A protein has these predicted regions:
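C-terminal structural segments of small proteins and small subunits
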Residues: 55-76
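Short helix-coil boundary/hinge micro-motifs
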Residues: 2-15, 19, 75
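Generic secondary-structure boundary/loop-capping signal
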Residues: 15-16, 34, 71
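Residue-level signal for pocket-adjacent positions within structured domains
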Residues: 13, 50-52, 69
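A short, structured beta-strand/loop element
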Residues: 21-60
Length: 76
């Protein structure tokens, strides 16, 4: 069972390195940031609200998301 929950304030995930796309540019814009938790889970937050809620995914969930994105499952 995870010690993290969805909607946890990102400020409670102290000491993490948050990553975002290099394509986001210097102003940040509407970017998603991710961080890898010591438990192996992956946290995601909105760069415009870095202290706001974070979504937490298991590694298999994250891998499935990346696979779907790479396969075009989310394309319009």
């Amino acid at each position: 069972m995870s010690m993290y929950r969805n909607g946890i304030p990102a400020t409670e995930l102290a000491g993490l390195t948050w990553l975002k796309s290099q394509r986001s540019g210097p102003t940040g814009g509407n970017c998603v940031e991710v961080a890898f938790l010591p438990s192996g889970e992956v946290a995601m937050r909105n760069s415009r609200d870095p202290g706001g809620p974070a979504l937490v995914f298991t590694r298999p969930e994250w891998d499935a998301f990346l696979g779907g994105a790479g396969d075009g499952e989310f394309s319009c």
